[in-house]
Design a protein with these regions (language model features):
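Short, compositionally biased
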Residues: 3-102, 121, 198, 203-232
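An exposed tryptophan-centered "aromatic clamp" motif
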Residues: 83-86, 90-103, 109-196
Length: 232
């Protein structure tokens, strides 16, 4: 399991998943690296609750359909803004990513799958073997002033669950791709555990509430946040 270290991104350094690094004054956690360890992807320690899109009246297609690279989706939205006389205020989540500095963007569908695979220990099975990875990463993030990877509400009866994450990739019908565990059964400190839960992707509306489920927890219990990423 990776032990986090804090360092500024350097061209001569080697990194591994779980390292805490600083890029342009913004701290992030390394979530992907190439074979050399010199290049990869960091994810912001800070999360955002901002909506993908500002108003229901804007439930249009922006051509942000790229699944491999969220920066391409950022550029698609930038083109949409220029061509339609709009502004970044119409896309609060992307405006937040831009506020972090040059090069920060909301990850694509495939990038989210890669991030969760790496943070989960190399696969998409959330079980007793992989839960310690998330807990270790979460401690590193919080120790460096970041936001919790877990959340809880009345539907979880006080037990923590792993928050889903929102992608920059549009789906059909005014929706966007997100990633979360199957049926939201991801209670990390429940006495019974959550064995063999599959991490999966599905779609929510651009203006959908970030949690679903009823107070007694009889329905699906999900919550979604967003984090930005930056290549190095």
């Amino acid at each position: 399991m990776a032990i986090a270290v804090v360092a500024a991104i350097s061209a001569n350094a080697q990194y591994k998943v779980g390292d805490i690094c600083t890029l342009g004054g913004v701290k992030g956690i390394v979530v992907d690296v190439d074979a050399t360890g010199a290049h990869g992807l960091i994810m912001s320690l800070e999360e955002s609750k901002a909506d993908w899109i500002a108003h229901k009246s804007l439930a249009m297609e922006t051509n942000a359909f790229y699944e491999d690279d969220g920066m391409k989706n950022m550029q698609a939205i930038e083109r949409y803004i220029a061509e339609n006389g709009s502004s970044w205020y119409s896309f609060p989540l992307f405006a937040w990513a831009r506020s972090l500095g040059d090069g920060w963007y909301i990850p694509s569908r495939e990038e989210l799958i890669t991030i969760w695979t790496n943070l989960n220990g190399g696969n998409l099975d959330l079980n007793k073997k992989s839960r310690p990875y998330w807990k270790t990463h979460n401690k590193s993030i919080k120790r460096n002033g970041g936001d919790d990877l877990f959340c809880k509400n009345t539907s979880t009866m006080g037990f923590k669950m792993l928050c889903g994450m929102i992608s920059s990739t549009e789906a059909e019908g005014g929706k966007v791709y997100v990633i979360n565990t199957e049926k939201g059964q991801n209670l990390m400190n429940h006495p019974m555990g959550a064995p063999n839960v599959k991490i999966m992707e599905y779609t929510i509306g651009k203006r959908a509430h970030r949690s679903e489920g009823d107070p007694l927890g009889f329905k699906r219990v999900l919550r979604f946040r967003a984090r930005a990423v930056h290549k190095f």
